[in-house]
Amino acid sequence: MKVSDRRKFEKANFDEFESALNNKNDLVHCPSITLFESIPTEVRSFYEDEKSGLIKVVKFRTGAMDRKRSFEKVVISVMVGKNVKKFLTFVEDEPDFQGGPIPSKYLVPKKINLMVYTLFQVHTLKFNRKDYDTLSLFYLNRGYYNELSFRVLERCHEIASARPNDSSTMRTFTDFVSGAPIVRSLQKSTIRKYGYNLAAYT
């Protein structure tokens, strides 16, 4: 961790250092989203040790079986002692179900007509911890996925546009008879916009 980042960490008055020191796992839960938005993160692989039950980070000498059943986490690495490194991962505080539901401060319409609700029925989906981890991974690295999606789409457009003697067309409302070319000439800004929209599916 850089000196500037360490100062941000200490200035925010987080108690994650103490938690990391007292935790035997290499992976330590941290409920502060502010911390992960202000300090650079990295993706590391972890596994559960069968003998001790502890969560350990994958290292060079980690066995093949442990590597095979490892999982990735977005983390902040922290040195808590001489040659002792811990990894903080963002985990939301567990909701207090005993207190009952908390009224939303946002106005919710009685009937939602959005296609995403009526067609895909997303409001009926049930999420587990792995689903939340996946969404958290995307949220914390959305800039990377946005750029990756744009680069992939840009490359696909270049290859499709360079195909020789491609006369493939598609009927449209304006060109119903002869049809319009399937591969259109697009500006880089347009491809980038489409790529960003696809980021969640990469």
Swiss-Prot record:
Top-rank taxon, per record: Eukaryota
Pfam families documented for this protein: Sir1
InterPro entries in the record: Sir1_ORC-binding, Y'_ATP-dependent_helicase
Recorded family membership: Belongs to the helicase family. Yeast subtelomeric Y' repeat subfamily.
Protein name per UniProt: Putative uncharacterized protein YLR462W
Organism from which the protein derives: Saccharomyces cerevisiae (strain ATCC 204508 / S288c) (Baker's yeast)
